[in-house]
């Protein structure tokens, strides 16, 4: 009886119309990610308006580094979500619990290693990236605090991944609302009221994520008694660790590749000076509004594909791909038009007196990278569906091509031609390059699994 009650609360994507199921699952996650992006934009506005252009450039320069070193956590989070969704499709509650526990062990071990690495090499990495002396000290402080508190986002994202693996993106949204609202409140308090500077912004983020992790843990174990750990669940499970690792490593490496591309892009932007760095920080925050929704649709497709793969319904996977492409086209078109019309006005919010140079850089970045968001949507669909059917290595091959293309175009634009527009072309070019291999791999794999 308890099992039926628990399962009924989830979204079972093995039955029903694919486009309706994907939208029902994507919408709460999409709203949550948009809300999270609203926080990111608000954080940059608070830093830019109260601390100035140098502080905004400092915070922006650290983001590729933080995301690069956090790539292993991202891989674990996505991997555990896919595995939990697979065992949910099989109705195997014991393995769902054990997979979650073992992901916690793996994540804790890796986060400790990343914390030590980040504390040791933060200043060196920022100097290697060519960060100007003006924002360097504040950037180093922000980066070091982020790694000291790495355990906070780790725990929060692992619990959120468990909700998503169970098909419950709505509760994950509630936890995100707690994180975003507390983050904005603490950000204003620490930066605008207490005047703790860039360090205050870093501590605000960590404390908000810690609070959200606690809320997520309470909700997970209260709402889903089947996820409450028994003593036997606490043992290390070699087979599950291997499954998580096999999924996590390609995803983590691809995430690292993506962020390595962003790190190279940040290094390229640093060549153009502090004003361009501040403009890029604002532009990348705004541009994510167009790119993040299609990433969310792709992520939802991986859960959909995993559930149907686990349930032995391969014919529904191809239907899910078509539905995801349709959703991506609609969402990316609407948001692309919005940013084209309103991007320059949004950029004016980040600094008290933004220069014409900053506003122009933001506008050109959005026109070239965010407006053609459908290219990113197609790439995400084909990469994510491969992950959902246990073909993460093929998705990784697409990620490698994406990275190589982005770095090559950015390098030509920055170090060869000294032309920012060419640097920005690295984004759409990489989306196209990252699609080719996953597309043809999926066509081949789809035929294979449909005849199994």
Regions found by a protein language model. Give the residues of each.
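Transmembrane helical elements of multi-pass membrane transporters/channels
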Residues: 24-43, 145, 156, 179, ...
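Residue-level hotspots within pore-lining transmembrane alpha-helices
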Residues: 31, 35, 39, 69-73, ...
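Short alpha-helical transmembrane segments in multi-pass integral membrane proteins
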Residues: 1-26, 84-151, 193-249, 305-372, ...
